[in-house]
Design a protein with these regions (language model features):
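Charged, often flexible domain-edge or linker segments that flank or initiate folded functional domains
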Residues: 151-360, 366
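SAM-dependent nucleic-acid methyltransferase catalytic core
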Residues: 271, 285, 292-296, 302-535, ...
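Domain-level detector for long C-terminal conserved domains
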Residues: 119, 124-125, 131, 135-226, ...
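Hydrophobic transmembrane signal anchors and adjacent membrane-proximal interface regions, especially
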Residues: 72-74, 98, 115, 126-134, ...
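A periodicity- and composition-biased signal for non-globular, repetitive helical segments
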Residues: 57, 104-107, 465-466, 590, ...
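Short amphipathic alpha-helical molecular recognition features
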Residues: 29-35, 42-47, 475, 539-542, ...
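Generic recognition of well-structured, leucine-rich alpha-helical segments
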Residues: 4, 44, 48, 61, ...
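WW-domain-binding short linear motifs
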Residues: 1-52, 57-194, 204-205, 212
């Protein structure tokens, strides 16, 4: 039956078109059962036929008879073989199966691999008189059971799942217009962006060597990207281009901390002795080669020579003696060394930012030239007042035709290639991306652009991480599965404030890149996310400026909403010195409880979980983790951290720590030495 002549009683999203048919005067009298509403069905009235019918806003199906839901789990039963058949129909047909149009029988585009039919997620309206409508956790029986585009390997059947995309969201937001300032992703642009970011990293490396004689501090470029995007007003999703101040506090602090030499963790006495000698020698050499005041030269040279003389005559000192002497030397020489290095380090920060702004401008010009209809400056849309369940961010600018991306499989890895550039993801996460795309994308029902968008997504995160071994993965670490399960079961958590399509546990989350990630369930950056109600998990990247901005946003949201709102926050328990974000949360009037998980007694999931080996999936945390419950009054009533719930959460951490698989060496051990 055609949908053109029908009208839905309860339109649920701004992007859905409405028919000319009139709606019933009393929508509640036509409401179907709750389980059908959750699956996207609404009961409508056909003015032409003068009788009711059922319409599914996810699949655009229309039925005269009451739909029958199949109990279908797309992970354990991807073909819907165990789904309950519709009554009085062929058991081989899914619920409401219809004839396929001739256009659907035709082959897909160059990036299509003919996935199973499935609904896309839509927005959901909230009203005071009706309970919240909830989107289906899994689609009903697919109307055209198909096969995977790849051959199943034995590992597929035994693979452990690190996510639960069946959890229904309880996050409520105000309806928003599609984002008009983000350009749709394109492989050509993503390839050029990758080349420019790699070039920028190389410039940073060369500047540190030429001006200060040091290697760039590990992960400092990645944290620079995070810190800059907190305040950046530019258009590029990755490269900062419009920041005030120009000098990055994060990059400046980290480079200065490694001057005159980087201080590493010491285990043995001889290492401590060598480190003390190197520091004294480097400080003296630096003060001699820079434009320092006579007083600074005198202080640094005297302390350096005194330390060297002490090292020559005292060979019985312990490791602690050497470390105490090093700390004393840093206190005496550090301010003078920092003073002579200040202008040079500021020059490094300024040069990198200027190059980034130039690369960003160049990328946008090229990107606009690829679009069929370049966007025009539009007036800001008026704020929407309608409350809806959270849905993925939408782009206002339509996507152009995308070039071909090749897909093949090597053992357990899916390999996607564009112009000779290959990105990889394991089979399990590739299937996860397919599910997320199916639930979230509304402009590509035949998956014609799926492979291109997956390539752009993987390339973006590969470039953000960097090319070093384990580089960047520590900034994308995730909580263990057992902890997520407990958070959902005990505290109603259904949304992650800091995640990505690759490491998310739930199907709804906030992430760094709305342009690439929105097609896979993301709501965009958390600092732009304004929920009215819901229970959220927040495990931010360990960047101090980002965490501080996060706390400000938490308090604003909790102060403005009278609906149940809860944030369970996981941050490093850094105490020497303590981070501003942790101090502010501990003093917040919204803090309801605080837990401390000791170092080496809990784990994180690797940020490289989509490509790493199974025995490298988890790593031990070398720092304690503070768990803070920030809730408004209504959130505290609904999701209070009671002793019983807290005991379950602690037990979940213990369960994850008793894992028998070998643990890789922590990739975040250097974070303790960041100060």
């Amino acid at each position: 039956m055609s949908n053109d002549s029908q009208g839905s009683v309860c339109p649920t999203a701004s992007h859905l078109s409405h028919s000319p048919d009139s709606y019933s005067d009393d929508p509640l009298s036509l409401s179907p059962p709750d389980e059908l509403v959750q699956a996207g069905w609404s009961k409508c009235w056909s003015r032409r036929e003068n009788r009711p019918y059922y319409f599914n806003r996810f699949t655009n199906q229309s039925l005269w008879e009451v739909p029958v839901l199949g109990q279908h789990d797309v992970i354990s039963d991807p073909l819907g073989l165990n789904a309950a058949p519709a009554e009085g129909g062929d058991s081989n047909l899914g619920n409401g199966q219809r004839k396929r149009r001739s256009s659907e029988e035709q082959g897909g585009g160059p990036n299509s691999f003919k996935p199973k039919d499935a609904p896309s997620a839509g927005e959901r309206t909230l009203t005071r008189s009706v309970c919240y409508q909830v989107e289906p956790t899994t689609p009903i029986s697919p109307s055209t059971p198909g096969v995977k585009p790849w051959s199943s390997a034995p590992e597929d059947k035994q693979a452990q799942i690190y996510w639960d995309l069946d959890v229904q969201t309880n996050a409520v937001i105000r309806e928003q217009a599609p984002a008009s300032h983000h350009l749709p992703p394109h492989p050509e642009i993503e390839l050029q962006r990758a080349q420019l970011v790699t070039k920028l990293r190389q410039h940073y490396h060369e500047l540190c060597h030429q001006r200060e004689g040091i290697d760039p501090p590990r992960e400092s470029f990645n944290r620079w990207l995070l810190e800059r995007k907190v305040i950046d007003k530019g258009h590029d999703p990755l490269l900062p281009s419009d920041c005030d101040p120009v000098i990055s506090p994060s990059m400046f602090r980290e480079v200065m901390n490694d001057i005159p030499i980087r201080l590493s963790r010491i285990k043995y006495k001889e290492e401590a002795r060598k480190l003390l000698f190197k520091y004294a020698e480097a400080a003296k050499k630096m003060i001699d080669s820079r434009n320092a005041s006579p007083e600074s030269r005198k202080v640094v040279k005297w302390n350096a020579e005194d330390t060297m003389n002490w090292l020559r005559r005292d060979h019985s000192a312990s490791k602690e003696d050497y470390m105490d002497r090093l700390e004393h030397l840093r206190q005496q020489c550090g301010p003078h060394v920092a003073a002579v290095a200040k202008d040079s380090v500021e020059g490094i920060c300024s040069k990198i930012y200027q190059l980034s702004a130039e690369y960003s401008r160049r990328l946008r010009q090229t990107h606009l030239s690829l679009l069929q209809d370049p966007p025009t400056e539009a007036c800001a849309s008026p704020p929407q007042s309608r409350l809806v369940y959270c849905y993925p961010v939408r782009l206002a600018i339509p996507s152009p035709a995308l070039p071909r991306v090749e897909l093949h499989f090597e053992n357990d890895m899916a390999c996607l290639r564009f112009r000779g550039e290959m990105v990889k993801v394991n089979r399990g996460h590739f299937s996860k991306l397919e599910l997320l795309y199916r639930y979230s994308c509304i402009d590509d029902p035949r998956f014609d652009k799926f492979l291109s968008r997956v390539w752009c997504l993987l390339k973006r995160y590969q470039v953000m991480f960097g090319s070093g071994a384990n580089e960047g993965s520590g900034l994308q670490g995730a909580l263990p599965v057992s902890v997520f399960e407990t958070l959902n079961r005990q505290f109603g958590v259904s949304f992650e404030c800091f995640a990505s399509p690759l490491n998310c546990y739930f199907k709804q989350f906030c992430s760094a890149f709305p342009d690439t990630d929105g097609f896979f369930g993301s709501r965009g950056p958390f600092l732009s996310f304004c929920p009215v109600s819901g229970s959220f998990e927040a495990n931010p990247p360990f960047c101090e400026e980002l965490m501080d901005a996060m706390v400000t946003h938490f308090e604003d949201l909790l102060d403005q909403s009278s609906e149940p709102l809860s944030f369970i926050v996981f941050v490093p328990e850094w105490r020497d010195p303590v981070t501003p974000a942790l101090t502010r949360m501990e003093a917040s009037r919204f803090l309801r409880h605080q837990l401390s998980i000791p170092a080496y007694e809990h784990e994180y999931r690797s940020g490289s979980q989509h490509i790493c080996k199974r025995d490298e999936m988890y790593y031990r945390a070398v720092h304690g983790t503070a768990v803070l419950f920030l809730q408004n009054d209504a959130g505290f009533v609904k999701w209070a951290p009671t002793p019983e719930r807290l005991a379950e959460l602690t037990a979940a951490y213990r369960a994850s720590s008793t894992r028998t698989s070998s643990l890789s060496q922590s990739v975040s051990s250097d974070l303790e030495l960041r100060q």
